[in-house]
From Swiss-Prot:
Its EC number is 7.1.2.2. The record marks S361 as: Required for activity. GO terms for molecular function: ADP binding; ATP binding; proton-transporting ATP synthase activity, rotational mechanism. This is ATP synthase subunit alpha. Pfam families: ATP-synt_ab, ATP-synt_ab_C, ATP-synt_ab_N. ATP binds at G168, D169, R170, Q171, T172, G173, K174, T175. It is an enzyme of class 7 (translocase). Keywords: ATP synthesis, ATP-binding, Cell membrane, CF(1), Hydrogen ion transport, Ion transport, Membrane, Nucleotide-binding, Translocase, Transport. Produces ATP from ADP in the presence of a proton gradient across the membrane. The alpha chain is a regulatory subunit.
Length: 507
């Protein structure tokens, strides 16, 4: 009897203390699924870019919001989602793990490690889609980001916070320039993010191996959305990279981000848009493709001192077809960025590496990103090359040239030899200035064109190894133009070296 009373009392107590918690879930149902896209009905309050969850824990992103249907891109194999599947709102936007733990790591577009190393701590996350800094949160670009490539640092200088497009046909050295820029940031307190979109996994593996070998992976994060990945992941990859870079920028750091390449990103977005039944426009791209790229690239900025002074420098890459820079995507990105480095395949095939077309390449930041000494040393370079290219085109008609015209042609050929540079061998600013002084003061006129590569190698060794000459170079103030007395002393040493070289006394 006592047992019955105790049981009844326990039940009564449980009923009295019961607190019914009602959980509301916005759910819908998959109407159509195919090609990585699901059309869902029943979820009315979902937001653009919000994560939704299917029955088997597969996630999707709501990218199309219509009156009765929602277009969701599936972040997994489409075979895992079926018609009639239940879909639930998560009420959260897609985010990615950020922080210093990502340095030296290779992750996919969702921030999941794919390098076989330790798992990441997911406690620190940032939304992939965020607004770019406002005008009042920025300041003008006035600090240079050195690539170590003489032709770029002297003719099309890049500043911290700038967006400089690298554009050209396939196999013209676009990725090589970007990777060399990463290698040159070693010891400069610049974090790097390399975003590979639609690239072959084997090519990215070689890049990761090179970065590791050169000691650059320790300050670099690689995000891979390879050619075999789903279109949604290729679409998300650059925004994920921007979110990772923004975390460091807001921590007062300088960041360099490479988007390799935005042509494949545009194709991935076109694929998604057509599957979502959006109306196609020029070249079948959706109407908002310009917005997608401008929204991405505007997130690169030089923050004001009040916001910490951090920066993101973006080097987007665009692949052209047969050198056509007037196509839709190239013209879009050219108009968004602060200049472009145009690579021409004819120059590349003739042995001019990097194959930069000086006439079509420009930096809209310009000399604001250079030190005063570099401005002075490179001031006559573009004029010399412009005169050379003009005369070269004229000389093709077989016209007889006078001595002064022939001198300009010979000098131009020698300048291009000086500008040739092997990849993975960046030059310091001091080395670049010494080579530019050779050009500025016309000291290369006494050299034969075929001997320039050997001379350049010997001269750079001389600059580093000759104690007295090295002391003069090290005393140069980058913020000031060379004093006449100092310049005269340096020119005398260089002239003596050239005389020895021409006599065969330098090896």
């Amino acid at each position: 009897m006592n047992k019955d009373i105790n049981i009844a009392a326990i039940i009564k107590n449980e009923i009295e203390n019961f607190e019914g918690k009602i959980q509301n879930h916005d759910i819908g149902k998959v109407i159509i699924v195919g090609d990585g896209v699901a059309l869902v009905s029943g979820i009315e309050k979902v937001k653009f870019g919000e994560l939704v969850e299917f029955e088997n824990n597969v996630l999707g992103i709501a990218l199309n919001l219509e009156q009765d249907l929602i277009g969701v891109v599936i972040m997994a194999s489409e075979n895992s989602v079926f018609q009639g599947s239940i879909v639930r709102r998560t009420k959260s936007v897609i985010s990615i793990t950020v922080g210093d733990q990502l340095l030296g790591r290779v992750v996919n577009a969702l921030g999941i490690p794919i390098d076989g190393k330790a798992e990441l701590d997911n406690s620190l996350k940032s939304a992939i889609f965020t607004n770019a800094p406002s005008i009042m949160d920025r300041k003008s670009v006035d600090r240079g980001l050195k690539t170590g490539i003489l032709a770029i640092d002297s003719l099309v200088p890049i500043g911290k916070g700038q967006r400089e497009l690298i554009i050209g046909d396939r196999q013209t050295g676009k990725t090589t320039i970007a990777i060399d820029a990463i290698l040159n940031q070693k010891g400069k307190d610049v974090y790097c993010v390399y975003v590979a979109i639609g690239q072959k996994n084997s090519s990215v593996a070689q890049i990761v191996s090179l970065l590791e070998k050169k000691g650059a992976l320790e300050y670099t994060t690689v995000i891979l959305a390879g050619a075999s990945e789903l279109s949604p992941l290729q679409y998300l990859a650059p925004y994920s990279g921007a979110a990772i870079a923004e975390y460091w920028m807001n921590k007062k750091k300088d960041v360099l981000i490479i988007y390799d390449d935005l042509s494949k990103h545009a194709i991935a977005y076109r694929t998604l848009s057509l599957l979502l039944r959006r109306p196609p426009g020029r070249e079948a791209f959706p109407g908002d493709i310009f917005y997608q790229h401008s929204y991405l690239l505007e997130r690169s900025a030089q923050l004001s001192n009040d916001k910490g002074g951090g920066s993101i420098t973006a080097l987007p890459i665009i692949e052209t077809q047969a050198g056509d820079i007037s196509a839709y995507i190239p013209t879009n990105v050219i108009s968004i960025t602060d200049g472009q480095i145009f690579l021409r395949d004819s120059l590349f095939n003739s042995g001019q590496k990097p194959a930069i077309d000086i006439g079509l390449s420009v930096s809209r930041v310009g000399s604001a990103a250079q030190t005063n000494l570099m401005k002075w040393a490179s001031s006559s370079l573009k004029l010399n090359l412009a005169q050379y290219n003009e005369l070269k085109a004229f000389a093709q008609f077989g016209s007889d040239l006078g001595p002064s015209s022939q001198l300009i042609l010979d000098r131009g050929n020698k300048i291009y030899e000086i500008l040739k540079q092997e990849n993975q061998y960046p030059l310091t600013e001091r080395q670049q200035i010494m080579l530019l002084i050779l050009i500025r003061e016309n000291l290369i006129d006494s050299l034969e064109q075929k001997s320039i590569p050997l001379f350049k190698s010997a001269f750079l060794k001389y600059c580093d190894s000759e104690p007295k000459f090295r002391d003069k170079i090290e005393k140069m103030d980058y913020n000031r133009v060379l004093e006449p007395n100092n310049l005269a002393g340096i020119l005398k040493d260089i002239t003596d070296f050239i005389e020895k070289f021409n006599l065969g006394n330098v090896f």
